[in-house]
Amino acid sequence: MERAAPSRRVPLPLLLLGGLALLAAGVDADVLLEACCADGHRMATHQKDCSLPYATESKECRMVQEQCCHSQLEELHCATGISLANEQDRCATPHGDNASLEATFVKRCCHCCLLGRAAQAQGQSCEYSLMVGYQCGQVFQACCVKSQETGDLDVGGLQETDKIIEVEEEQEDPYLNDRCRGGGPCKQQCRDTGDEVVCSCFVGYQLLSDGVSCEDVNECITGSHSCRLGESCINTVGSFRCQRDSSCGTGYELTEDNSCKDIDECESGIHNCLPDFICQNTLGSFRCRPKLQCKSGFIQDALGNCIDINECLSISAPCPIGHTCINTEGSYTCQKNVPNCGRGYHLNEEGTRCVDVDECAPPAEPCGKGHRCVNSPGSFRCECKTGYYFDGISRMCVDVNECQRYPGRLCGHKCENTLGSYLCSCSVGFRLSVDGRSCEDINECSSSPCSQECANVYGSYQCYCRRGYQLSDVDGVTCEDIDECALPTGGHICSYRCINIPGSFQCSCPSSGYRLAPNGRNCQDIDECVTGIHNCSINETCFNIQGGFRCLAFECPENYRRSAATLQQEKTDTVRCIKSCRPNDVTCVFDPVHTISHTVISLPTFREFTRPEEIIFLRAITPPHPASQANIIFDITEGNLRDSFDIIKRYMDGMTVGVVRQVRPIVGPFHAVLKLEMNYVVGGVVSHRNVVNVHIFVSEYWF
């Protein structure tokens, strides 16, 4: 039975003891279980050890203290595991990878948190479906949600890339808000449905009207007991027991432990054996065994007298066949019978009866060739053998050609006539069945005729090969390796280089700057700047490019200073310089160039073009076409080798955007610096100019 409990917050230690509080009821009313639980929490928090002795004489209080201490320790260890996953991104505990209880809980929560972070990184849902347990599922969901981030990158007053950085939002851990955590407000069992907390009771208890407490069910009154007929039901706390209320029956007596014990009538002297008999006890009764033993051929009657046994009646077939049994005092004799036989019969070997003479038995041939002798009681007759018929003209038995007389009805495949019979045979790929007429398919695959896989078909078999192999055109049974790298699609199997191996293939990547992706086919760029394997000096900035890295040092020109937004960053793809004129420097003040930025972009080799490739976005800080607003003009002033790039103006999300596009293929390795200008023109005069130097590195590979 379940009822919804009042939706109210209860201190966590009391939730953990919803079931344990029942143990104390009626045992020691002076013991305050809440205080015992608080002691257990303090021991876990300060001592980190639940095995220390508890200063109490109450068994129930010690049980509560131990359970609350272990519960608090589990929460502390789980919080440590979540911190390891978020801060170190690995689950190596300070105590090493041991099998202690602390390390087990720390590692479990750490692994569950890493799974949640990995699910978010792979774009999967944070609503977990793995059967990993309730606590692990809550940690999984919390870490998955917390690892989402948002953000954006500005280049001066522009936004020169379309990268998005997500700002982490603080979310409350749903596991900490579980109202059934530790037992909830319920005294025995608790279930949080989301809308409310539902309490229920153990077997043998029922829920009270307060929806929280439980009371014992009297099964003896409600009739829910299982006592059998002849037993009385006695109620106990949470259950019941059955007690026998009738006697055990004749020959048994009831013991103190409600069981039946055999009565030894011989020892107690309550038997009725006569003086010439000895009493022998049995289970539930007794037996009277006579003292006098009779000789062979005699049996004792009820009074102990020896009387003769008639073996001719009591024994089944006491004499051999052909003999008659005659009873004697204490024994019997057998007398032989001598019968007289007529014509066509003779006495059997035992001489007991007459049997038929088989005139047809070899080597006698009373009927001659082509005929069959048929014996009959006291005589015989001659007829044609099976497979022959009697020719009235020649007066002889002639062979029957069954194959011609019954075409297609005798054999499954082929029929061959023989003298007096016929033989059936089968085509290739079949064998004769047990009936000698039907043909059944031969499973040629049982003899392994193929080099790899074999499929039995009706009357034959077919060889086929495993993945990565093909059947030989020469013998049709040998499997030859398929060179996947030489197939028309082989160039697209691997992103760099394909290596054929027996039954499969392997992909490889350039010797440096790349590693093979988990799918075993694509090559992934190694970010040397992130992994720390670059050799850039302290005055240089490491920029990752496809297949390598570059160490670059950008200095602001005279009358310009480094932007504070990029000055404090340890790693960025953009360096921005803002104009900072000295006092009374009129030339500097009237110079329209306000910002000079350097940014780095890495591109693969585009060997074929179907449409221009958009690579850089310059976003203006003012909305398009406001009243009395400057006209924004984008231009490439330097570094556009062979006009491989162009820039167009576009309006996106209410902003004016300059889009740099690659319009011609470039085969790497290639390095160029594009100088981009964004001019604010008012009345035909440039009032404001931002300069962006884009360092373009083109890889020699297309990936």
From Swiss-Prot:
Major subcellular location class: secreted
Keywords: Calcium, Chromosomal rearrangement, Disulfide bond, EGF-like domain, Extracellular matrix, Glycoprotein, Host-virus interaction, Repeat, Secreted, Signal
Sugar-bearing residue positions: 98, 535, 539
GO CC terms, sorted: basement membrane; collagen-containing extracellular matrix; elastic fiber; extracellular exosome; extracellular matrix; extracellular region; extracellular space
Pfam families: ANATO, cEGF, EGF_CA, Fibulin_C
Induction behaviour: Expression increased by estrogen in ovarian cancer cells.
Limits of the EGF-like domain: 176-215, 216-261, 262-307, 308-355, 356-398, 399-440, 441-480, 481-524, 525-578
Annotated segments matching region Self-association and FN1-binding: 356-440
Disease: A chromosomal aberration involving FBLN1 is found in a complex type of synpolydactyly referred to as 3/3-prime/4 synpolydactyly associated with metacarpal and metatarsal synostoses. Reciprocal translocation t(12;22)(p11.2;q13.3) with RASSF8. Fibroblasts derived from a patient with synpolydactyly displayed alterations in the level of isoform D splice variant incorporated into the ECM and secreted into the conditioned culture medium. By contrast, the expression of isoform C was not perturbed in the patients fibroblasts.
Protein name as catalogued: Fibulin-1
Species whose genome carries this gene: Homo sapiens (Human)
Encoding gene, per UniProt annotation: FBLN1
